Amino acid sequence: MLYPNQKTLATIAGVVVSPLNPMYTSLILSKGLKMGPLEGIKILDLSLYGPGRYCSMILADLGAEVITVEIPRSAGKMFGMMTSDTEAHYIGLNRNKKSIALNIKKDEGKEIFYRLAKKVDVILETNRPGTLKRRGMDYETVSKLNPRIVYCSITGYGQNGPYARRPGHDINFVAMAGILGLSGSKNGPPSYIVSPMIADVLGGTNQAVIAIIAAL
């Protein structure tokens, strides 16, 4: 499924994908520099929020071909700052990427996912542990279709342990780490450090980028 006002960019594994906000290309691509250290690497991004999208943005800037899987009818509505019909964070985090709207809860959507999984080099996801396993989209399943796949999962509390199934965002993690306790006035409550997203970026994005590149 293509989003409105977007032209077809490519067909991969028989699946048509489209450009994400083609008017907002990065400086590198707009200057006509076509090569990058990850040129030829294909990445399927199942993530929804900052850590995963920022990770695949960096990989796309390095030359990888990134295809983001969007929830139908929700593209561009997941972040906070609106610009016309598309949010500013969404535009920034999805530069240089392609997209496909896919309902992975349905058999048809999963079949398309499997076709793409056979052709890509990397799959990136940010679901809670066990979510994609229940849908038959976990590493064990995908690696049987594509033994060379690099499968990266970004989670808040790891794959196992007492907190593994808990949802969480940056503010939860920095609070648990005690960072919020270092902020604010001496006798007042802590103040949330708005930017940068310390836990999401340093603990999630950066480590994921390093791990993926190392695995490749």
Segment roles from a protein language model:
Residues 24-216:
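N-terminal helix-loop segment corresponding to the beta1-alpha1 unit
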Residues 3, 18-20:
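Hydrophobic alpha-helical signal/anchor motif
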Residues 10-17:
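Acidic, Ala/Val/Gly-enriched low-complexity intrinsically disordered segments
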Residues 2-8:
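Extreme N-terminal basic, low-complexity initiation segments
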